[in-house]
Amino acid sequence: MILVTGANGNLGSATLAALHARGATATGGSRTPGVGVRRLDFDDRVGMDLAGVSTLVLVSAGFAEDDQVIGRHAAVLETASRDGVRHVVYTSLTGAGDHLGFALAHRATERLVRTCGLPWTILRNGLYAELFGGLLMWAGDGVESAFGDGALAAVARADLAEAAAIVSADPARHDGSVYELTGAPITAADVAAGLAVRHRAIGLEEYRRRLLHEVPGLLPFQPPMLSSIATGVRHGFLDGTGTDLAGLLGRPVSDPLAAAVAAASAMRPGRVRTTAGSVPQATA
């Protein structure tokens, strides 16, 4: 049986759905389980149970400080080794993102995966197209961002979920592989054009100020994380493409621009509350 962690999150639920669509025997794990999902709380080392799981899809629990994330991942990997899991598939971060504020937890987890004693596969996911679109801020009759003219090799989340399903359904074929799963470059101006509005660039200082002073509810690690994405895109560090994703899918990657436009459109004034803080998670 395949178990997908974070089954109530966006990537986890999409991966589980993709596995079921392929006819795979799969279930989800979550600290808040529902129908067809078993309880799996990374903070409950004693209560964690992976008995009967042959392949574990470890969706990064990256929405926390590094020490918490790494500790949680270490706990589930220890449980996997104890309970007889035979393969671990980890959803990591693209290698181009090593400078990002949340990269260290991914690289530390990759080290844990490689040394846990189990066969493994690492999926280095590019940033979601949905994230890129969701980070644009509506202002008047247009959108603003700190991305400047930079491009992001964005990926539709559904493509990453399908890739995870393909790998976990036949893990032996992908044993010891590290895949760089990036998409096609898009810019904030491209998204604005798809929305039929204008894009206005703001500086990184102004963006950080808004995150720190105008956005309620952000956790302490979020402003530097989001600022690191903005400067990475703005200065051309996240626009590199590759062929791994299309190779796994056996088809061209989905259009990331369409996904980004849809995400930005969902933030349009009058549909939801729109502030710089209405931001999606980078890894879920």
Residue map of PLM features:
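Oxidoreductase cofactor-interface core, primarily capturing Rossmann-like NAD(P)-dependent enzymes
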Residues: M1-T27, T32, V53-S54, A61-G71, ...
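Conserved Rossmann-fold cofactor-binding substructure of NAD(P)-dependent oxidoreductases
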Residues: R38-S54
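Hydrophobic "lid"/C-terminal helical patch
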Residues: A164, S168, L195, A230, ...
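Amphipathic terminal alpha-helices
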Residues: L249-A284
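Terminal hydrophobic/aromatic helix or amphipathic segment near a protein terminus
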Residues: A192-G236, V272-A284
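Short, amphipathic alpha-helical "lid/cap" segments that border enzyme active or binding sites
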Residues: A74-L77, R157-A165, G242, P256-V261
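Conserved residues in the N-terminal Rossmann fold of short-chain dehydrogenase/reductase
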Residues: G36-R39, A201
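Short acidic active-site motifs
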Residues: D44-M48, L160, E206-Y207
